[in-house]
Amino acid sequence: MDEARGGPDKKKERGPKRPRKVSPTYLENAALHYLKRYAATKSQLQRVLLRRVDRSIKFHGGERGEALAWVEALVAKLVRNGLLNDEAYAQMKAHSLRASGRSTRVIAQKLRLKGVPAEVVAKKVADATHEVSEEDAARIWARKKRLGPFRTQPGTREENRKRDLAALARAGFSFGIAKKVIDSNPA
């Protein structure tokens, strides 16, 4: 019962939540719950499960090697069953990032950080670039951030030119593309 209903708040009395003891069943349930909520790569899911394993071992004790074997077996099982697919994840992520105006460099970096293999990254970034060119992506990014021709106060465009070029460069676009977009007329 909480204080609003007239009783003490038990969560405050108990302190921090105890981690559950790891078992193959617990790890599988945790993995399925995570995959219901988030799209993930193999390495992302492994990281999540290993954090749970480490927390549990720190509290309950136990053998980390055995838990690592459980995690490896579980990830292999999920890949076999089609619940984990790095290629599908990379394709979805690359297309959504490109549609939101991200550069090729940023897309590749984000996919590599998520643990997608390099050859898959190269293929999926190339596929995304076929649909939306680098220049179109830069134009989308400039419109989102109100840079160059998309400034709300057109009179300040020339005095903010260097700042706008720098913003596009930080977003991963080349100087040539940034210059072309910033110096273009509003569409």
From Swiss-Prot:
Residues 1-23 are annotated as: Disordered. Gene3D superfamilies: Winged helix-like DNA-binding domain superfamily/Winged helix DNA-binding domain. It is found in: Cytoplasm. Residues 1-12 have a biased composition (Basic and acidic residues). It comes from the Bacteria. One of its GO terms (biological process) is regulation of DNA repair. InterPro entries: RecX_HTH_2nd, Regulatory_RecX, WH-like_DNA-bd_sf. One of its GO terms (cellular component) is cytoplasm. Keywords: Cytoplasm. Its main location: cytoplasm. Modulates RecA activity. Belongs to the RecX family. HAMAP family: RecX. This is Regulatory protein RecX. It comes from Myxococcus xanthus (strain DK1622). The gene is recX.
